[in-house]
């Protein structure tokens, strides 16, 4: 068997967040939140979603997360323990880590990313014994670099790596793509790739135009990117479930 065997063809899922119905969900504590699921795992559990916290919402007591939890604040203000997080903040609670009490100081919207098997349990004075959250008050303050694919620097691109899972190599990144970029054609990745458009425009092909608020899931070993291009440039939040690579077809 070679690397090209057992590839899927054109099964990417692209949608706009406005088209996803809001569900009421209880994720942290007892107060419900608004949830627009982006992707669910095979067992029905949430992998990623857009969470809306109304002003005054609170998680109550600190919690322990069973698996890694990441979130990126899109708008609003969130009290996260002693930190106040606004738009463009990013945080990770490692598996088994102590997640401080949260409170929405304003209506707050975030992208939530969870690993498989996520659950939350109350903490009983064990904060100092558990991994602490990783907090980036401004994700854009992370030093950008020019990505290199197949030995070719992508000049005009900016990649900011926000977090890497030390066990799997899975990363979460901000990617700025310059205006007028056109991709090199069909490709696939060995891992799941999820993309949320934060600003601008992009399309993986002509049938899937994306704008701010659009979401794209490229399943692992799925051929996609047939006519990738952007007119005005864009900023994307990307996350994966393993070490990312790009394989040309």
Q: What do these predicted ranges mean?
A:
Residues 1-43, 118-168:
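A short, N-terminal "cap"/entry segment at the start of jelly-roll beta-barrel domains
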Residues 64-80, 179, 185-205, 211-212:
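Glycine- and acidic-residue-biased ligand/ion/polar-headgroup-sensing regions
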Residues 49-50, 59-65, 82-83, 102-103, ...:
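Short histidine-centered beta-strand/loop micro-motifs
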Residues 80-99, 204-225:
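Short acidic-glycine-tyrosine-enriched beta hairpin
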Residues 33-34, 57-63, 153-163, 169-172, ...:
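Catalytic core of non-heme Fe(II) oxygenases with the double-stranded beta-helix
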Residues 36-83, 200:
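The feature marks the first
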Residues 70, 92, 105-122, 216-217, ...:
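A short hydrophobic beta-strand segment most commonly corresponding to one strand
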């Amino acid at each position: 068997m070679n690397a090209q065997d057992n590839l899927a063809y054109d099964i990417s899922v692209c949608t706009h967040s406005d088209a996803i119905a809001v569900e009421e969900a209880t994720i942290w504590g007892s107060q419900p939140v608004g949830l627009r699921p982006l992707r669910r795992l095979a067992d029905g559990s949430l992998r990623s979603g857009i969470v809306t916290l109304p002003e005054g919402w609170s998680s109550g007591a600190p919690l322990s997360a069973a698996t890694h939890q990441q979130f990126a604040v899109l708008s609003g203000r969130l009290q996260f323990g002693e930190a106040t997080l606004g738009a463009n903040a990013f945080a990770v609670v490692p598996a088994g880590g102590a997640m401080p009490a949260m409170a929405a100081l304003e209506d707050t919207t975030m992208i939530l990313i969870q690993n498989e098997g996520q659950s939350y349990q109350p903490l009983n004075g064990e904060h100092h014994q558990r991994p602490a959250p990783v907090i980036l008050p401004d994700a854009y303050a992370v030093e950008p670099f020019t990505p290199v694919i197949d030995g070719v620097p992508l000049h005009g691109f900016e990649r900011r790596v926000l977090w890497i899972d030390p066990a799997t190599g899975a990363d979460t990144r901000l990617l700025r793509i310059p205006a007028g970029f056109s991709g090199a054609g069909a490709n696939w990745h060995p891992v799941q790739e999820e993309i949320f458009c934060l600003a601008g425009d992009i399309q993986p092909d002509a049938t899937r135009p994306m704008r701010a608020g659009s979401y794209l899931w490229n399943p692992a070993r799925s051929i996609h990117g047939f006519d990738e291009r952007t007119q005005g440039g864009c900023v994307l939040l990307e996350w994966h479930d393993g070490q990312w690579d790009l394989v040309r077809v």
